[in-house]
Amino acid sequence: MRDKIAGALFGMALGDAMGMPAELWGRKRVKAFFGRIEGFLDGPAENDVAFNYKKGQFTDDTGQALVLLDSIASTDYEPDTRDIALRMLAWAEKENAFENNILGPTSKVALANFRDNIQDSRITDKALSNGSAMRIAPIGCLFRPEQKEEIARYVYQVSRATHTSDVTIAGAAMIAEAVSSAMVKDDFDEVMEDVFGIEEIGYGMGCET
């Protein structure tokens, strides 16, 4: 199981780094520009986000996932929203994420509000972005796939600093469930059954959009 957890983390970082040059681009544009991406590449100057990165670098997806892991490890795996937000903000400032257009729209506003001591949950409650889902994969390593209620609840707890809407919690819970299931099951259809089995639970955890 330790090897599978390590594989999930390395796979996340390697896949992120390999996909980095195509950040935010649609399939058609990616195929026209790159043909096929079969190895690590520099972020192209034409990409408004990826131009910040060199080949082999992972993006904010993995960066935030590692911040999240650092936070929960420091609090004995009891999610602390303030600690997560503080660490996310410190990471963002270190990476110049606000200036370099690295943060997504929801995380950017939520973290800026936290920094400026502005209490306003509207941006997180109505979020339609994927900031929680993109960093959530490691959470799936902490649970067995049948623990769907526990997974969804934990996903909400570690996401609420930036995302609290039903659709974002459901999406993130499905990613975490996919990782949890794939670690113990080899059948793709069984994994997908688990993934869709947590969708409504995740929706029920978040604020209605």
What are these regions (language model features)?
Residues M1-T209:
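Structured, active/binding-site neighborhoods that engage oxygen-rich ligands
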